[in-house]
UniProtKB/Swiss-Prot annotation:
Belongs to the MEG family. Residues 1-23 form the signal peptide. The keyword Secreted does not apply. Expressed in stems. Disulfide bonds join C44-C59, C49-C78, C57-C74, C60-C67. Keywords: Disulfide bond, Signal. It comes from Arabidopsis thaliana. This is EMBRYO SURROUNDING FACTOR 1-like protein 11. The keyword Disulfide bond applies.
Amino acid sequence: MISSSHFAIFCIILVSLFALQQYEIGNMEENLNASKIVVYLSPCVRKRCSFSLFKNCHCCRGKYHFCSKNIKVCEKECLRLNPPRPLP
């Protein structure tokens, strides 16, 4: 048979393990949310211009093509021509 002091120690350990497990679950959720990395993928790629031998144009990746020497202009037009799909 278990003595009362052994039973008390067992109960303290059991309660401590439950509290530790609850803490780890909360900590794990925080770490999961903090580890979500957002990667920006430009809608434009560098390509060779039709009028040049160098890769100095930026063209849309999507269905509708547009090329520009300026990356900002390309991104703006590509997002207008090929809007990103909504996330599920």
